[in-house]
Amino acid sequence: MSGTQMSAFLRQYLADEDKKIRAQFKESDPNNKLILWMHEKTRITEEDLARPYTEDEVKELCLRTKVKVDMTAWNCLWEAKKRFEAKGRFVNKSERFINRMYVKAVRKKMVQPYPEEFVAQRREVVAAETKKHNISRLDRWQRKKTQNLSAQESSPARGAHLSFIDAMQTHEDQVNANLSSVSQINFQVEAIARPAVSSSDLSGIGDDEDEHQQSEFQDEHINCPETAINENSVRCDPINSGRMRTGCINSQGNNNTESDPDYYMFGTQLSSLLRPTSTQEPDDQVNCPETEMNESWVRCDQINSESMSIGPSIDSEGTITFQNSESEPIDVDSIA
């Protein structure tokens, strides 16, 4: 579609409009810069009117632009209608009555029809404005198409770049996994090749330290006669290899003396197993079968036989004896 040329009336009309706008919004005022910039962008020029439309542009405009018809522009009957409605003449009236009122308004020259020349000039102005709007629409749509095409062209390159990055990351992960497996294998090989440490190699470690601590302990307690322990009290006699009765052992603290606080002072209080205990009667110990224990339960290498009553034992001759030297043998026949 070929372009149109600007008529003299349209040129004069546009010049007058430009003067009005520039007179109202002066360039000296900095606040009017935006308004003047918008006016310069939307102003109709001869180049806009001379621009032809292509078939694709016409098709796109017809498909994407809504057609609007203003039936009230330069219509004297519309003006008469507004006057009658303002007076309330059309309230509850029929259509026939309304049409008769329009004819009457024109006949009596209440309203006059617009001249054809005036209507043609106004239509020319509207056509120029419409073409300016259409050119703006086409330019905007073309920019969007260009942006979409550039985005589509860049998307394959971006996808290839992302795939390359993923491949590199996968390769790095595989290399790291291989390195970790190799290091683990080397560690296992070193652990296997490392010579084992035997128990003989560890013998003697810490002996000097134990001897040094033992000598210091003896030096601390050498001058403490209150806490001195008789050699016979810590000597352990061999325990009977047979079954022994340990029940009902009296561990009363009847032998505590005034020297007990000395044990707490020097931190050398003996255990209850090493304290002298009173000797029980044979009858009290014989009547405790529930406390009978096997020698595997009580394995003691350092039990004081003189200060602790182990219990009676029967020899091959049928005589009940005690390990304590103070107890006398008991004849079984006399008891029966």
UniProtKB/Swiss-Prot annotation:
Keywords: Chromosome, DNA-binding, Nucleus, Repeat, Telomere. It comes from the Eukaryota. One of its GO terms (cellular component) is chromosome, centromeric region. GO terms for biological process: telomere capping. A motif (Su(var)205-binding Pro-containing repeat 2) lies at residues 289-295. Residues 137-158, 199-218, 308-336 are annotated as: Disordered. The keyword Ion transport does not apply. Residues 107-328 are annotated as: Required for binding to Su(var)205. GO terms for molecular function: telomeric DNA binding. Interacts (via C-terminus) with Su(var)205 dimer (via hinge and chromoshadow domain) and with moi to form the terminin, telomere-capping, complex. Interacts with HP6, which is also part of the terminin complex. Binds to chromosome ends in a sequence-dependent manner and is required for telomere capping. This is Telomere-binding protein cav. The gene is cav.
